[in-house]
Each structure stands twice: as structure tokens, then as C-alpha cells.
Design a protein with these regions (language model features):
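Membrane-interfacial amphipathic/re-entrant helices at transmembrane-helix boundaries
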Residues: 1-18, 25, 45, 53-59, ...
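Single transmembrane alpha-helix segments in multi-pass membrane proteins
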Residues: 3-61, 76-82, 234-246, 266, ...
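Loop-to-transmembrane alpha-helix initiation sites
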Residues: 10, 85-87, 112, 144-148, ...
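Alpha-helical transmembrane segments within multi-pass membrane transporters and channels
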Residues: 21, 54-99, 153, 254-255, ...
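Helix-loop-helix "hairpin" substructures at the membrane interface of multi-pass membrane proteins
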Residues: 55, 70, 140-218
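Transmembrane helix-bundle core of multi-pass membrane transporters
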Residues: 85, 89-92, 96-164, 194, ...
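Cytosolic-side transmembrane-helix boundaries in multi-pass membrane proteins
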Residues: 158, 176-190, 243-247, 262-303
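Transmembrane alpha-helical segments in multi-pass inner-membrane proteins
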Residues: 200-278
Length: 303
């Protein structure tokens, strides 16, 4: 039972990465490779602040802000210096590999002896679950799950609210049709900057939470996060089909949890962990290709 709850918690923490990819890719049509670097940056900054005795909330927000700055850098390279989108993300991610190592000071920093947000959640919410008859270990994991679920729910609510405002709607329109937005006098560069700041801030928040959940930060922990995010977005879309903004956000989070459950099941079935990244790529490919075959099949049946 603890393993299942842990899988849910980890999947929800990574759902913030998926939401970031949803914002950059779905809403702004921006294939942002910065995700890998900003995830690690959020974890690294939060870990350094925590080990320095900083308040867990401030440390987590600091990691989130650092990720937002990374997204701004990618947007600046593209929108104001004319660097192609993929190349801008690659350049920033490459630079962040050095930045993360310098900030962390070494390749891995344990968080033992520090008080994290999840420790506080366990201390505050855990007794509530214990009163239902759960063991202390199970109640602690349930408390961590409830906390991360609350963070993801709040993120979805804030994104849904913001992108339905006049400014948010204009940003979405600029992402869909930038040429028309420029013709209407919209500052598409500023919109891209804000969008990538939000996307990478969410990704860095995920990194900060994952580091606190795992109990350490590592300079390699962000490798493959952009693929995880894409897999979650496409898997969520495959699960629910075409939906509006709110449904898309919820489906993306559900896709992350579902994907984490699939990964856990595959590992328990004997999948070599060395093949995990390759399996992730296959899932993304399947989610991309399957709808086309289903569409062809439906057309064939109707003709």
C-alpha cells in the first residue's frame, strides 16, 4: 500500500513538469528543451537553501523562481535575439548543466538533517490519517500524497483562472497565431517570455518537491524530464480526447500519474531500469501515432 501511495505521490509531483510542458507546447506551440535544466535548477536551488537553514517554503519558492528565470532566458534568446526555438532551449539547458553543478557545489547533496515541506506536511496532516486507523508510516505517506495533490490542484486552478482572463486569453491567442497577434499590435515577445517563465517555474517547482521527497538533489536528475512531460501530455490527451483548457490541464496531470503507474508496473514486471528512458520514448511515440491509426480506421469503416 505504501508503494502504491508513493507512486501516486511521485507521479503527482512530476505532473507539475507535465503542466509546464502543456503551457509551453500546447498553449504557446513552443518546443521548450529547457525543461531538463530547469527541473534540476529548481531541485538544486531548493536543496542549497534548505541546507543553509532557509525556511522550506521560501526555499521551494526560490527554486521555482530560478526556473522561471531560466525560461525567461530561453524566451529572450528566441524572441529578442532571433535564436531558433529548439536551439535557444538547447543553449540554455547546456549552460544550466554548469550552473547547476556550480550552485550545488558537487554532484549530489543529501537533505538529511533538514526540514522539508513534505516533512512539515507529514507532521501536520499525518496525525489526521493516523486517527483513521492507519499505521504511522502509511499515514505519513498519505499526508505527503495529500500535500502534493493540493499543490497540483492549486497549480491547475491558478492556470485555469489566469488563462481565462483577458491577458491570459491574449497570450493563448498569441501562441496559436503569432502572426495575427503581431498584426493586432500584441507584444508576442513579451507573451512568450511570460509563458516560458510560467512553464519553467512549474517545472522547477516539481524539481524542488521531488528533491525534498527523495531526500537529495542531484545534477543529473533532470535528464529526460522533457520527454516525461511530453509523454504525460499526450497520454492524458489520449485518455480523454479533445477537451477545453480546464479538461486539458486535469488530463495532463492524470497522464503523469498514469504514466508513473505504468512505469512502476513495468519495473515490477522485470523491466531493466536501463531501458526505462527508451520505454518512455516508445510511449510518447505510441501516443503520437495511435490517434492517426484510429482516425484512419474510423474513416475506413465509414466508407
Amino acid at each position: 500500500m505504501i508503494t502504491l501511495l508513493s507512486t501516486w505521490t511521485f507521479g503527482l509531483a512530476l505532473a507539475l513538469v507535465a503542466l509546464g510542458v502543456f503551457v509551453s507546447y500546447r498553449l504557446f506551440s513552443f518546443p521548450d528543451i529547457t525543461t531538463d535544466g530547469s527541473f534540476t535548477l529548481g531541485a538544486v536551488v531548493a536543496a542549497v537553501l534548505l541546507t543553509a537553514g532557509c525556511d522550506p517554503i521560501l526555499a521551494t519558492l526560490g527554486g521555482m523562481a530560478a526556473g522561471g528565470l531560466a525560461g525567461c532566458t530561453t524566451a529572450l534568446l528566441h524572441a529578442f535575439f532571433g535564436v531558433e526555438r529548439l536551439l535557444a532551449g538547447i543553449l540554455v539547458t547546456t549552460a544550466l548543466a554548469s550552473v547547476n553543478l556550480v550552485v550545488l557545489g558537487r554532484s549530489n547533496v543529501p537533505l538529511s538533517g533538514t526540514t522539508t515541506l513534505l516533512d512539515q506536511a507529514e507532521a501536520g496532516i499525518g496525525p489526521v490519517f493516523e486517527r483513521t486507523g492507519l499505521s504511522s508510516a502509511l499515514a505519513g505517506e498519505a499526508a505527503r500524497l495529500a500535500f502534493v495533490l493540493g499543490v497540483v490542484g492549486l497549480a491547475i486552478a491558478l492556470l485555469w483562472t489566469f488563462f481565462r482572463t483577458q491577458l491570459g486569453t491574449a497570450m493563448r491567442a498569441g501562441g496559436d497565431t503569432p502572426t495575427m497577434a503581431r498584426a493586432l499590435g500584441r507584444n508576442t515577445g513579451g507573451m512568450t517570455l511570460a509563458g516560458l517563465a510560467i512553464a519553467n517555474g512549474l517545472t522547477a517547482l516539481s524539481g524542488a518537491l521531488v528533491a525534498q521527497y527523495q531526500g537529495f538533489a542531484d545534477v543529473q536528475m533532470g535528464i529526460g524530464m522533457v520527454v516525461w512531460g511530453m509523454a504525460s501530455v499526450f497520454l492524458g490527451a489520449a485518455l480523454v480526447g479533445p477537451v477545453r483548457l480546464g479538461g486539458g490541464l486535469v488530463a495532463t496531470a492524470a497522464g503523469s500519474v498514469t504514466f508513473r503507474l505504468l512505469v512502476a508496473a513495468a519495473l515490477r514486471a522485470g523491466l531493466d531500469p536501463d531501458w526505462l528512458k527508451a520505454a518512455t520514448a516508445v510511449v510518447v511515440l505510441a501516443a503520437l501515432v495511435a490517434p492517426r491509426f484510429l482516425t484512419r480506421g474510423s474513416h475506413a469503416r465509414t466508407h
